[in-house]
Every structure is written in C-alpha cells, then in structure tokens.
C-alpha cells in the first residue's frame, strides 16, 4: 500500500474569514477581535484583506462609496479594515496586508507580457489563483524583528456567491490543500435575521450561505451568527446539524455596546479556545490586563466632551473612520467620552452659519480631503474658532486651511491653495515639485502622492513638542500640496508659528498659535490618526481632547482672543506673485 502524502511541515496556521447573505456583517471587526484574542494569548498574529474589486488600490475611489483610505507605514493605500487590524493587534502592517483583484491581474498580465508563462494560455485557474496564493503565503515572512507569525488571519472581502470573490475563495481552498487541513481554519460570518411579525429568528439564510460555500469545496470550521440578539441554544444546535459544523464552532454574536467589547463577546462564546484547539496552537490564558483597562475607560468615563468634525464627506462616517477612532482614543487617555458632532463644512462659510453649527461644541477638528467643495466652510470654522479661543486640530487639508485663514487675516485677502484656485495671486499652498505632472494630468493619479511615514523635527517648547514629549517624530502622509515657503514670513505676522518641519527645514509639517494668542490651534500636514491605537492613544489627539475639556470646564465662556491686526490690501502683498515657489 503506497504511503500517504504528507503535507509540508509548517509552524504557521492560516485562518480565513468569509461572509455570506449580506455585506457589512462586521467581518473585519470579527477578524480583528479574534486576532486581538490570539495576540493576548501570546501568539504572533498578522492579518490580510483580500478585496475583489478591480481597482489596484482604493486611493482613487470615491470616499462616499468606499470610506477612508488607510495608509500604511510603507506608503500603501489600503482598505479601511487594515486600520481595524492595526488598532486591534497594536502593530504596524505593510502594503502586503491588502490585496486587490486589480493588483493580481496587473501582476499576471505583466508576467505574460514578459513571456514568463512560456506560451501558456493564461487563465483564472491556475494563473490568477496562483498569484493570489503567492500573496497569501508571502505573509508567512519574518517581520523586522525576525519573528514569523504563528497565525495569519485572511479576510476575504465580498459575499459568498459573488462572481468577483470566486478566484479568492478557490485560492483559499488550494492553500488549505497545500498546507494541510490541520493547519487551516475557515470562519464564516452569516446573518440570522429576526422577523418581528412572527417573533422568530430565521436560520435558512445561513444554511443557504454555507451550502454555497460548500459547493466550491470549502466547509467552514466555525460560524459567526450575526444578530441583534443572542441566538438560543436550540437554534445553534439546528444550525450545527444542518451546516455540518461542530456545536462548539457555532458562535452567537449579538450587537455589542462598542466595538471594543467584541473580543469579550467572542471569548465568552469560547471561539478563541476552539480555534487554538482545532489548530493545535500553544494554549495560554488570555491576558486581559490592557484590554480591561481600555474597557473601563470606554464604559466609565469621568467626563464628556463634544467635538465638531467639520468635513466634506460626513454622509458616510466611514470616510473618517480612523479620525473618529483616534478622537475616541484621545478621550480614553483623558478618561472622557467624546461625543462627535458631524458638521458639513458647507454649513460654516459665514460667521453666522459657523456660530449656529459650532455654538455648543468644545473643540473643532478639520480632517483631510480633496477638491474645492466645502473649503470656504472649513476656513470659516477655523476663523470662528480662532476668534473665540475654541480648540482646533487640523489634519492634512486642515493644516492648509489654517494657513489660508492666517494669510487672509494679515491682508492677503485672495490667499488660497493652488489646488482650489490655480489663478490665485497668493498661492500660500502650492503644488509639491514632484507632484506637478500628476496635477497637470500628465502622470497617473493613483499611488503617486507623498505617501507613508516621513520624519519631522519639532520646535522645542512648542505645543506639539510638549504633546509628543520629543522633538523628533514620524507620521504618515497622503498629500500633493505643501505650504509655500515664499509666504512664511508674511503668514507669521498673524502669530502662526511653523512649529515642525521636515529634517531639512523645507516642508512645513506642523503649525500652531502660541498659547498667548490661542490656547490650542494646531495643524499637521500628516495623518496622525493612522497611528492611534485604542490602548495607546495618539499624543496629538490626547492633547486636543485635553484642551477641549479645559475649554468646557471654563463653562464655555466665549473669551475674545487677542485681535490680530487686519491689514488692508494695498497691492504690496502681491509683489511675490511672480516669485518661484520653493515648494
């Protein structure tokens, strides 16, 4: 009798997360929470998202359709779920953590053009699926510290049954075949709807979803049952029988009070113990020390603070997901609950409209964005807040709006950004030299911005240096425009201080007003929200929430700030209009 073929020995386990019935079931949060639980058990965990859309990355996608673009340390523009992964695992991931159909097809077609397939007919199977497998298995590589992951959690985007997802599901099936069933685990998320008229929970959608998954060769090892209430044991037993899943692997996940409660929900259902047992991983108790402290701060705040987020894309809160999470984490650092007021920037263009929109808030956050719509409203919100001592934090475009508002306050009444008004006589925000071809339409827009982590040097004793506790920092970026250095001296007449620059002093990274001019009005060209963690809040957000609490505790008495002399336009301010911008 021939010997059975042995699978290659591997120390790394693969856990695939799929979804059925409907989208937006919380696959990303489920995967992130399970990753957090396994990490708390002392395991090395990394994560990956497979997205079935044809875009190479989400960088050029409409934020109303896709939500935010999450930028990694190495400059990849990725899905917002990668942000969940980083926040729950408390570790940085690379661009390899997000794979799209567009990336896969681009690579395969490029190989075909180079003749690497030696005349083969290039097809979805095996060529596309092989490229997907290569990217999945590449996650097994050691990190910068030389540690290989114990577990790779791979979330497959889309819904089982979608045409777009089929190559990814087939690739996952083949990974299981290659690494061995004992090294692979499939977790399927499904909806159990509650029918109010009959007062029943329905299992049929889950049964059909699992049947569709099994029809392509994948039998789930565990099921996440999403519902607005607990699924009773008799129904769990029925689902286990009809879907051929162990009863220990049928997990009820009712809606939780906050996303940070989800690990506790999964642990209560013993999902992490079941995964450890099935994959033969080292069994250690969960260390809840750090997470329990987080949950105390989430559920037992000592104070409440109201922050206005003045944005262009507020109709879809996911467009500012990392900003919102960083604000909440800043509140955790101050033992405070942050109540967010979503304010459309168009509603703040005049003093009267800004006063109406921002009347009872304790702080104003101006997030990033692109395009001219709503810009005057962002500037109007900054003007209102500056006059009244209301704390402000500006991110990326927010810094640029702070600079424009400051320039206008000292007589450069037509000051603007070259992005919004290419013909402005005072382009206080100019196009970066290496971005001019992209802006002119002579180069690709996708993946060509100033992306990823860059260092900055802060002015000693500045507000930002005090917040960070150091003068050397690194933050992630995503922009094409910068402060025009030609106007630095003129803008400084407003009192605005350029408190942080690139190490060579050329690119403005941070601006602020000194405390004697305004208690907290700070802008950064970076996106610090991308490095915030619930258990390690970002210092800028913690400082901003702290300043907002100070404003609130002063009973919101609107104190008029020292008046900045308003310069009358006399034509002299345009003497620089023909000077070449050093930006």
Curated annotation (Swiss-Prot):
InterPro entries noted in UniProt: Class_I_gatase-like (IPR029062), CTP_synthase (IPR004468), CTP_synthase_N (IPR017456), GATASE (IPR017926), GATase1_CTP_Synthase (IPR033828), P-loop_NTPase (IPR027417)
Keywords for this protein: ATP-binding, Glutamine amidotransferase, Ligase, Magnesium, Metal-binding, Nucleotide-binding, Pyrimidine biosynthesis
GO CC, any one term: cytosol
Binding site for L-glutamine: 369, 397-400, 419, 480
Catalysed transformations (reactions): UTP + L-glutamine + ATP + H2O = CTP + L-glutamate + ADP + phosphate + 2 H(+); L-glutamine + H2O = L-glutamate + NH4(+); UTP + NH4(+) + ATP = CTP + ADP + phosphate + 2 H(+)
The enzyme's E.C. designation: 6.3.4.2
GO biological process, one term: pyrimidine nucleobase biosynthetic process
UniProt region (Disordered), positions on chain: 561-583
UniProt binding sites for ATP: 24-29, 81
Top-tier EC class: ligase
Subunit structure: Homotetramer.
Protein role: Catalyzes the ATP-dependent amination of UTP to CTP with either L-glutamine or ammonia as the source of nitrogen. Regulates intracellular CTP levels through interactions with the four ribonucleotide triphosphates.
PANTHER family xrefs: CTP SYNTHASE, CTP SYNTHASE-RELATED
Name of the molecule in the record: CTP synthase
Record gene name: pyrG
